[in-house]
Amino acid sequence: MGGIGCFLVLALARFAAAPAAEAVKYEVYAVRFATISNFPVSSLIAGADRARRLDIAMTVWVLKGGNGSVALVDSGFHREQYFRQFAVKDFILPSDAIAPLGIKPDQVTDIFLSHMHWDHAGGIDLFSAARVWVQKDEYEYYTGVAWQARNTHGGIDADDVLEIVKRNTMGRVTLVRGDDETSISGVGFHIGGKHTWQSQYVSVETAKGRVVLASDNAYLYENLETHKPIAQTLDAEANVRAQESMRALASKPNLIIPGHDPAVFDRFTRVSERIVKIE
């Protein structure tokens, strides 16, 4: 074998023997920035008793990466109109709610947006440096055809849409194309089962295993424990399938975190009055 051939064989052998890069590990925190009181459980769990009420947690999730990144899953809300529509109490700005973790708003590098409803997309403007990650189909629908009829953009705030479009014109929106576990080390994006046009949920690698942040694709632990679809979905069967996928992804069942269940803040280690660490 010639010299060039030997060199190629040795180079390939070294490449094959090189260990794969280890995924970035994250610390994950649930941050409660508000409560909505007396919320009907029948709007959360399909078929639930209409008389049931629950004080639901309004939450963003912080992902602190071992590589120095700081990401949020969802951004909360702060527009005044929603304080008139809902019984909001104990509110602080999401950008202030993360302060006990030593994070300033301009240190947030990314927002992984589960969907474009007002209570999840309404705080993007509070984090001026962040790149927004949203499903491509979700973005295209709610920046376009959804506004051609009166009943196809429920829960979507036009000002939130304009903020995301503005950020896109600045080159700071990434359109996620379906399931994606390769774009960001240690983070996976997964189709969420049609809570909105194309909602998504997020999986995160931590030192204790893989955490799944369901957001509104599973509102409460009860959705997950009773295999009940969420009440607000465009496709109940797809939502149940998404919940099954969450179970397969999470390292342990207790590492699937629902979107609005106040019990999250009783089940995990408290860091401050409004924050628990998911582990």
Question: Which residues fall in each region the model found?
Answer:
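Metallo-beta-lactamase
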Residues: 22-23, 92-103, 107, 137-191, ...
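Cap/insert and terminal regions of metallo-dependent hydrolase folds
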Residues: 91-92, 199-279
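Active-site metal-binding motif and surrounding structural segment of the metallo-beta-lactamase
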Residues: 88-134
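Divalent metal-coordination and catalytic microenvironments
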Residues: 28, 63, 74, 108, ...
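Conserved beta-strand hairpin/beta-sheet module of binuclear metal-dependent hydrolase folds
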Residues: 34-96, 201-218
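Short, electropositive alpha-helical surface patch
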Residues: 89-93, 124, 131-135, 189-195, ...
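Bacterial N-terminal signal peptides
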Residues: 2-14
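Active-site metal-binding loops of divalent metal-dependent hydrolases
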Residues: 33-34, 75-78, 116, 137-138, ...
